[in-house]
């Protein structure tokens, strides 16, 4: 099994914070979001390699991060050569790009590089193995109050981000 981490977005909604830093490399406490994700992937013995697909703008930053990775997996950063939102490939395009350039002919665990989660991927992969079927991992938000937005001292009762889609990757 191979793992593809999607990291080719430009995170424009978080500007200026992410204007010169990819979202996955932002630190939460003493770890980057990407470290939190790779820690979870490292627990999955089935995963042999991690491919991080990114863009031209952030490629060198991911390469630098990769040099400091101390986990058990082989990690490779792949540049999709896009330079802006206007010419980006999108998630499916980037996945195809990695499959084609790396000649992957194996099961693939596809994940966003910037989603934080606290569950083990091992049970998810075990379920995939037992069902022998493609799987998508989703998470129900029980307490939507945790996702309210505070704006200028006023509480906004509902903040909807990507309204219809309440899915947390990874998926196989």
What is the role of each PLM region?
Residues 20-36:
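Short catalytic helix/loop segments, enriched in acidic residues and glycine
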Residues 118-172:
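Conserved core of the sugar-phosphate nucleotidyltransferase
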Residues 23-27, 82-86, 171:
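A short acidic, glycine-rich active-site loop
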Residues 1-18, 25:
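N-proximal low-complexity "stem/linker" segments adjacent to membrane-targeting elements
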Residues 2-5, 13, 31-110, 116, ...:
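Conserved N-terminal catalytic core of the sugar/cofactor nucleotidyltransferase
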Residues 20-24, 68-70, 125-129:
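Glycine-rich, phosphate-binding/catalytic loops in enzymes
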Residues 29, 79-81, 139, 165:
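Residues at the C-termini of beta-strands that transition into short coil/loop
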